Amino acid sequence: MTFAAIKGHFFASATLALALVLGAPGAQAAPVASVEPEQSDVARLTPPKPSWFLINGGFVASSSRIYDAATGTLIGHVETPQLTDLALDPAGKYYYVSSTLWTKASRGTRQDYVSVFDSVDLKLQADIPMPGRLLVGGRLNNFVLSADGKTGYVYNMSPASSVNVLDLVARKFVRTVELPGCASLVAVPGVGLSALCSDGSLATLSLGGKKSEITRSEPFFSATDDPIFDNFQVDRAKNQMVMLSYTGKVYTATLGAKPVIAAPFSLQEAAGVVAGSTAPNTVNWYPGGVQQMALHPASGQLYVLMHMGEYWSHKAGASEVWQLDLATHKVVKRMAVPGEPRAIAVTQDATPHLITAGEDETVYIYDLATGKQAYKLDQAGGGIITVTPAP
C-alpha cells in the first residue's frame, strides 16, 4: 500500500470514529456552569501596632518585612531597595523611605527622593525629590523625622556634610543646610536637630528662622581613640539621647538649644566586671554589631549586644544581651543568645519583646517578662530593625 493510500485510510477511519462518537446518545457536551468573575482587591492592614517591627532584607531582598512580635507573624512588606533609609510616621499613617536610583540601573541620571507609603494598604502615595543623600545603608539616624512627623531630615555628603529638610505635609523639598564635620541626626523639638561631630562635640542646628545657626557643645568623647556608635537611641518623652562608645562607655545627653551631657559610666563596671579599654591584646566584654543597643524608654531599660573580644572588635556578633537600668547604672540581667546577632531592637508596648537578628537572617523574639524565646523566624532578614514608635 502506498503512503497516499495509508494516509487516506487513516483519515477516513478517524472521521468515521468521530462521527460515531458525536452521534451516540448522550454524547452532547455538558452545559458549562456560569462562573462569577473574580473581583480583585487589596488587603488592608491596621495602622502599625506598638508590637510591630520592620526588618530590612539587606542586600538579599529589596524590602523590609513587617512582623508582629506578639504573634511572630508576617504582616506585609515595604519597598526598601539597597542603601535606603526607613522612617516611621509618629502618627502611624505612613512609612517613609529615603532612596536613590539611576535611570540606567547603575548609571545615567541620578534621582534622590523620599517615597511615601500608606501604612494601611502599603500603596505608594508620593515621591518627594531632593538634591542628594549619603549612600550608606544600615543606619538608624541618617533619615529622621520631627516629633510631630511634619518634617523630615535626610543626611547628605557631597562632599561636605549637609542635611536636606523636607516638608512632609506639603510633600516637598524645603532647603539644604550645612552641617560641617557632623553626622548621625536626632530631631530636637522646637529647635531643629542635633548631630555627633568628628571633634567629639554635639552640634545643634537651629532651623527656626530663615537662616540656620549651628552651635557646638564642648568635646565630650574622642572620635579617634574611643568613638561613639552612630546607631544611638532616643527617649522622646525625656528628650534624651543615649550613646555608647566602642569601649562600653554610656553617655546621655538632654537635648535642647543648649544640650546637657552627663558624665559617662562604664557598662562593664555596671555589670561588675573590669571596664573596657583601648589597650591592645586585652580580652574583655565589649559591645558590638551593626545595631548594638535598644532602648525601652517607658521602663528606662537599655539592651546591649555584648561579646568577648579585644578593642576594635566592634562589628562582632553577640553571645549575650545585657540589660542596663539607666536610673541605677546597673546591669540587672545578662542573657545568653544564639545566632551571634548583630542587630537588636525592643518593641515599645507595655509588654515588650526583644528582637535579635544575625547574618544568617534568623530572627529571634524573646518575651522580656519571662526572658524566654517566644519565636524563631527563619530567613526573616538580617538588616536594620525598626520598631513602631511609642504611642
List each language-model region with its residue ranges.
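Surface-exposed loop and turn segments in beta-propeller and other repeat-based domains
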Residues: 123-136, 211-228, 257-285, 335-339, ...
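Short loop/turn segments that connect beta-strands within beta-propeller blades
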Residues: 69-71, 119-121, 167-171, 207-210, ...
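Solenoidal tandem-repeat scaffolds enriched in leucines and small polar residues
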Residues: 168-262
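Loop/turn-rich, solvent-exposed surfaces of beta-rich toroidal or solenoidal domains
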Residues: 285-326, 330, 334-350, 356
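Short coil/turn segments that connect the beta-strands within blades of beta-propeller domains
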Residues: 49-52, 91-93, 148-150, 190-192, ...
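Repeated scaffold domains used in trafficking and secretory/extracellular systems
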Residues: 38-44, 80-91, 135-144, 179-190, ...
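Short, conserved, GDST-rich strand-edge loop motifs in beta-rich repeat architectures
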Residues: 43-55, 98-111, 304-318
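Short glycine/acidic-enriched loop and turn motifs that connect beta-strands
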Residues: 58-61, 101-106, 159-160, 200-202, ...
